[in-house]
Each structure stands twice: as structure tokens, then as C-alpha cells.
């Protein structure tokens, strides 16, 4: 009998989601995440552009995950960008309440919830440092993770280091930045400091994989390097 594949469900916003071909090379990190795993792992990307914790639940997206997630699967949960907006949530009340619902949904099915703090936006100060634009949401998530004993990957901190390593100019390559007529999908040009290019999406996906390893989650044994060799 074939062993059941491990499913890794992703709940999040546009920085995680699969982007349509007409937006290429825009990509969420979830779009390329499956490339980092061996064959026994299936990534199920339920992330959606514009999603906040509350809209994701209200649109039935968490319910759709609940119907398919099973014992031993994983649910990675990254929200914050849209929870900041007026139609979103408050960090230490409704945001945490909805995150708790995500964690409980996974655990009720015998699956493992993992919180992931939001990716930073590409906003540099005059000293070449990334400015924090996510308010209290990442800290609220980390506080709740401690309370619920849910592992957390601090992608906020990891992306800050990544962007600063590239610097203000080179980091544009991680995002959807084009001059007019440089790319057929963006004839008028675009300067997007939130959404990733395919290169950026893969860099960020690798940071999530790094977080899985650092936490010592059993899922780490199924990670492969980009060259296709098992991680040592």
C-alpha cells in the first residue's frame, strides 16, 4: 500500500498565493514552495490576494481546508498585510481570535498548525534599513503562538535580513519592478514593493523552509535543496 503523502496547506494573502499568468512574473512564495520538497509532500495553496484572517474564514476558505486536511498534515498560516486595513482585524483581539480558529481547525484534524509572521514590505529608510510597516500584527501572532504552543516562523525578521542584504537597489529584483515596455505584462511599467518576482518568491520560500528546519518540525526531513539533493 502506498504511503499517504503529507499535505502542506497554506493560508495567507497575495504574498503567498498563486498568481495568474497575466501577472507573471509576479508570484507568491506558496507558488514555488512545492519545489523545495521531495515527492511525498503535496503543497495545497489556498492563499488568496487581499485575504485577511476574517475574510479567509468568512469566504469559506478555512472550511475548504478543514474538509481535506488530515492526521499528520500541516497548515502554515501567514496573515497581517490585509488585517491592517479597515475591513481587517485588531491585533490583540480579533486577529488573535481568528488565528486561534485556524490553529484549532488543524489540531481537530490531527494536523500541525504553524504560524508565519508577515513578509516585510520593501520600504527602506535613508540608512538602507527596512522600515517596519506591519504594526503590532507580527508581535500579536508571536504572543499567541507562545500561548497556544504553536510553532512560529518569523518571516518578518527573515525577510528584513534578506532585503537589507540585497540593498535598496538590488532588492528591486525580488519584487515586481519594471520600466515601461520592459515586460509585456506591464507595458506601463510597475513599482511594486509588496509582491514578489519569481526570484523573490523562491528566496522567501527558502526562508520558510529554513524556518521549518530551525523549528525541527518532522516536515524538515522531506525538504530538498534547489539542486534536488536531500538536505544534510
UniProtKB/Swiss-Prot annotation:
Induction: Up-regulated by growth on type I rhamnogalacturonan. GO terms for molecular function: hydrolase activity. Optimum temperature is 35 degrees Celsius. The enzyme is quite thermostable in the range of 35 to 40 degrees Celsius, and suffering a decrease in thermostability above 45 degrees Celsius. Keywords: Hydrolase. InterPro entries: RhgT-like, SGNH_hydro, SGNH_hydro_sf. Almost completely inhibited by diethylpyrocarbonate at 5 mM and completely inhibited by phenylmethylsulfonyl fluoride (PMSF) at 50 mM. Dimethyl phosphite achieves only a 53% inhibition. Also inhibited by metal ions (magnesium, manganese and calcium) and chelating agent (EDTA) at the same level. Optimum pH is 8.5. The enzyme is more active in the 7.5-9.0 range, achieving a sharp decrease in the activity below pH 7.0. The active site is at residues 14, 191, 195. Its EC number is 3.1.1.-. May play a role in the degradation of type I rhamnogalacturonan derived from plant cell walls. This enzyme has a broad substrate specificity, and shows strong preference for glucose pentaacetate, beta-naphthylacetate, and p-nitrophenyl acetate (pNPA). Also active toward acetylated xylan. Belongs to the 'GDSL' lipolytic enzyme family. Monomer. This is Rhamnogalacturonan acetylesterase RhgT. It comes from Bacillus subtilis (strain 168).
Amino acid at each position: 500500500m502506498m504511503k499517504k503523502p503529507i499535505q502542506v496547506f497554506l493560508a495567507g494573502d497575495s504574498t503567498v498565493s498563486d498568481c495568474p499568468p497575466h501577472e507573471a512574473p509576479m508570484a507568491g512564495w506558496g507558488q514555488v514552495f512545492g519545489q523545495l520538497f521531495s515527492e511525498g509532500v503535496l503543497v495545497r495553496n489556498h492563499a488568496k490576494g487581499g485575504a485577511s484572517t476574517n475574510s479567509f474564514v468568512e469566504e469559506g476558505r478555512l472550511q475548504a481546508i478543514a474538509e481535506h486536511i488530515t492526521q499528520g498534515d500541516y497548515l502554515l498560516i501567514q496573515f497581517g498585510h490585509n488585517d491592517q486595513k479597515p475591513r481587517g482585524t485588531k491585533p490583540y483581539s480579533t486577529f488573535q481570535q481568528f488565528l486561534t480558529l485556524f490553529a484549532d481547525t488543524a489540531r481537530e484534524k490531527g494536523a500541525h498548525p504553524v504560524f508565519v509572521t508577515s513578509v516585510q514590505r520593501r520600504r527602506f529608510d535613508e540608512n538602507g534599513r527596512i522600515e517596519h510597516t506591519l504594526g503590532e500584527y507580527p508581535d500579536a501572532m508571536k504572543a499567541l503562538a507562545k500561548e497556544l504552543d504553536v510553532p512560529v516562523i518569523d518571516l518578518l525578521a527573515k525577510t528584513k535580513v534578506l532585503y537589507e542584504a540585497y540593498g535598496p537597489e538590488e532588492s528591486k529584483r525580488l519584487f515586481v519592478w519594471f520600466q515601461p515596455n520592459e515586460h509585456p505584462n506591464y507595458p506601463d511599467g510597475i513599482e511594486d514593493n509588496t509582491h514578489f518576482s519569481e526570484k523573490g518568491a523562491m528566496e522567501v520560500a527558502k526562508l520558510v523552509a529554513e524556518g521549518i528546519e530551525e523549528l525541527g518540525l518532522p516536515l524538515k526531513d522531506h525538504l530538498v535543496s534547489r539542486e534536488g539533493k536531500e538536505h544534510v
